[in-house]
């Protein structure tokens, strides 16, 4: 699948225009995108990064990393996904960067999602749904998620997000209405961010292959 990831990432470079500030996500597919972006780094103003991991890789390529508070809205955001449904709704957060990813997606005019074919699903939920939670609310949120969804929340032990929070992964879901579930989970006190990108789905999904498919 690494070749499919690389092909999807390189296709996303087609959407990068001269003088842009590019929003950059996190994960193994995005790493290929950052490497490809490095070849045209002289053409862009810089990048806004969703994680310390991506920031380090961008800087290795000599790309300036900028603060979203100083850039205003972005023209383009490129990120991967753990699952993608036919409506371009996504599960994200396997790398625990979901909150910053969602912030950058919201600030961007266009969200390009790059995936390998294994990430395409008819219904979201086989991949456990990440939920970023304030540490003191972990047990409370887990109980409320169980009551609300019937899914099984599991604490991702040992993982602390770049924001200093913890992650619950919710197993055994079949998400037939992602927008409604995203809204409901966001109402639970202590929830920082839900790894459903449904209210703001991807605008374009690029599926790696020979040739890549654009959805």
Swiss-Prot record:
Keywords: Isomerase. GO terms for cellular component: cytosol. The keyword S-adenosyl-L-methionine does not apply. Substrate binds at residues 26-29, 79-82, 92-95, 119. The active site is at residue 101. It comes from the Bacteria. Pathway: Carbohydrate degradation; pentose phosphate pathway; D-ribose 5-phosphate from D-ribulose 5-phosphate (non-oxidative stage): step 1/1. GO terms for biological process: D-ribose metabolic process; pentose-phosphate shunt, non-oxidative branch. It catalyses: aldehydo-D-ribose 5-phosphate = D-ribulose 5-phosphate. Transmembrane segments: none annotated. GO terms for molecular function: ribose-5-phosphate isomerase activity. It is an enzyme of class 5 (isomerase). HAMAP family: Rib_5P_isom_A. Catalyzes the reversible conversion of ribose-5-phosphate to ribulose 5-phosphate. Belongs to the ribose 5-phosphate isomerase family. Homodimer. This is Ribose-5-phosphate isomerase A.
